[in-house]
């Protein structure tokens, strides 16, 4: 992780979805996998050879074109994402992994799949059916869904290694980054906090929109 004195660097990374570190990872031959919801296990999208990008639409203020396709009644998040996609802001994506959770993000991702929006001939969209109950049947269903709609497509489309060894490596990196962020967050608990809430959230957000091995 970079030192906190580089906060301006982190802030700049949040100005565009296709930021400096995303471009660097793409230049190294890695695949960019977009997602929008915490129901999508971030760590699975960070397997060796690819990296996850939680989609945002920085500085989008008026999603006029997206409203034509979606509706003014749809929340601004989904419309802003689609507006940015129509502007070409997500052309770096190699895939978009959706979840059957929030309706508006489902509609946005369906538009990505049905319309020729992302200028990448190999781009694809897939949806995972997420259970909302915690029982043994739900666990089995969720595991089957992640295998069929996340791991298998990554392996079949882009040759990503989905072995147990690769999964453990991705989990190790994810846990390392999470531990560092938790340690930074602990500074907020001091009697005289040495980091502001704003600074912490900039760092946290960067960890979700940049390749973790580069931050």
Predicted regions and their residues:
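A charged, amphipathic alpha-helical module
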Residues: 1-31, 143, 152-215
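TRNA-binding/sensing appendages of the translation machinery
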Residues: 27-53
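Domain-level signal for soluble alpha/beta catalytic cores
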Residues: 30-31, 66, 92-93
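Conserved beta-strand termini and adjacent loop/short-helix elements that scaffold enzyme active sites
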Residues: 36, 55-57, 128-130
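Short, solvent-exposed loop/turn segments at secondary-structure junctions
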Residues: 39-41, 58-60, 103, 132-133
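Anionic-ligand anchoring segments at beta-strand to alpha-helix junctions in alpha/beta enzyme folds, i.e.
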Residues: 44-72
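Glycine-rich, highly charged phosphate/nucleotide-binding loops
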Residues: 69-87
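Internal, well-ordered alpha/beta segment that forms a basic, Gly-enriched binding/recognition surface
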Residues: 90-91, 95-187
